Amino acid sequence: MKHNQMRQVVFPILAAFIWGTAFVAQDMCADAIGAFTFNATRYSIAVLALLVVILIRDGVKKDKPVLSAEEKKAANRQLWIGGLCCGAALAIASNFQQAGLVAGTDAGKAGFITALYVVLVPVFGLFFKRKVSVPTWIAVVLSVAALYLLCIKGDFSLAPGDLLLLVCALCFAVHILVIDHFTAYCDGVKLSCLQFLFAAIISAVCMFIFEPLDMPAILSCALPLLYVGIFSCGVGYTLQILAQKDSNPTVVTILLSLESVFAVIAGAIILKQQMSIREYIGCVVMFAAVVLAQIQFPEKKKAA
């Protein structure tokens, strides 16, 4: 497997693993601080963590590209626009997700509705003339079926909070497609850092408007906040951006949806939750979808 192919497969799987295991840390914060406070804090931590990485990397990097003043200006403009677009989509998606949970949607259904971006990404991609192969569409359907088995425990009926989560899924799909556009022009780590900067600003403004600033509550969640800030955001989302460079966004999305599988497994190992037969089947179906999405089928040759 070539280096680029390794990056396009391993990075999103690692991101999915980090996000799946981060649910434990998020649950620890949910009862202590509000959604906007949680997001503003974790995104701010991610900015600081990535700034350190950028400073160290740029300090030791020897083969820096030589750009003219005009080229630097154009590159910086693309970077800031990309950071703003990615950060806005991320902030809206994550805050709508938390609002849906606060409105009463259970975590399992929230996970399923949020992960519907697996379907929305290829559908939206059609409007940008991005072709999706038949095997990849089958993999998308399989992944949705797997998510249903993993996340939905009882009857599926729509509640008010579910509409907020549908908006969340739409925004995550937009987030993935915006990343797909800007990774062609921007440094992945710097783009990730700027998206967190704008997401932190948007969440902080909402926090000061809708939630009281409770420093003791924030400090009581210091360890889980550091985990989600550094690993879930700083590492996980940066891996997503690096994986999407020159990749098929639909295939990367299917790999990222492994988050639900890792969340179930983490719950079984860390929280000692019992996995049902239904969840085992869901894991198998999801892995089948991932394998199918990675198989390179030969294209049919047109008749002469």
Model segments located where?
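Specific transmembrane alpha-helical segments of multi-pass solute transporters/efflux pumps
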Residues: 22-23, 57-113, 149, 229-247
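C-terminal-most transmembrane helix of multi-pass membrane proteins
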Residues: 43, 55-59, 221-223, 231, ...
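Helix-helix packing/entry segments at the starts of transmembrane helices
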Residues: 16, 39-41, 110-116, 179-200, ...
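Hydrophobic transmembrane alpha-helices of multi-pass small-molecule transport proteins
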Residues: 50, 132-152, 172, 203, ...
